[in-house]
């Protein structure tokens, strides 16, 4: 598995544990993913994969209009993709 795929899978696994209706902050995702992968991915690597997963509609994000902070959740398509792994 290449590094990008490993990071994407770690993100999907992390978001799969978030209770329905709730969102996970960018910072929380980064911390959890960095603990799962050795060597730990950089912030830029994780941000790139978050954007790619969003473009693929496997996750969806909501931006706070005041702080700019992103919060994420896994989509049904993301759950299905994770089940295929």
Model region roles, listed by residue range:
Residues 1-23:
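Short alpha-helical segments that sit at the start of domains
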Residues 14-18, 36, 60:
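Alpha-helix C-capping/helix-to-loop hinge sites
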